[in-house]
Amino acid sequence: MKLLKNLGWFLLALLSFLFIYGFIQVLATTSLALGASPYAVTLLYVALAGVYVYVIYKWYQKAPVHIEKSGFNRFIWLPALVWFLSLVVQFFLPNDPSVNQQIATDLTLAQPLFSFFAVVIFAPLTEELIFRGMLARYLFPKQDNSKQTLLFLLVSSVLFALIHSPGTLQQFLVYASLGFSLGLAYISRKGLIYSISLHALNNLVSFLMILML
């Protein structure tokens, strides 16, 4: 019964991400497409998205997550290494951008100021809060052994990949590997700072590559 209740709460958090934060994004991008000032739209977006992040973060803080020491979180450098290796592997894969990546590319080229805040700042904040923080808080609050932690990492990685709308197996694996490294970052520090920072670094690299190439 408690598991079903917690599942319901997590789904509510997920729906808030999809519909409330999604509405904020659509409102901003539609306004830009209609010719509104990029500065005004970005300012409004930062304000609305900031309120959403604050509310979800306060919600996340209401209950602790217990994570025991294991092979998955023993080394603080492991998440960064996994992320770096997955990044290197992508350079040798065929160019196969997902719909989500293509949208991000087009948005970055058309509206770099807005895109910086959307992609580099708020995407890491919102996605880490939901797919690491709220997932752990409600469905994996007591990770007492390696099996529970591994299950959290796998579920987190799969959900993270699916939310980015992969159209091929390669796209799914790219997002899942990123999600796995971010999950490792979350459990290694038993909090969101590391995973948000690593996620922001990943998106910053992509953002700069789009602008420079």
What residue ranges belong to the model's regions?
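Transmembrane helix-loop-helix hairpins at the membrane interface
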Residues: 112-213
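Alpha-helical transmembrane segments
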Residues: 5-21, 77-84, 153-158
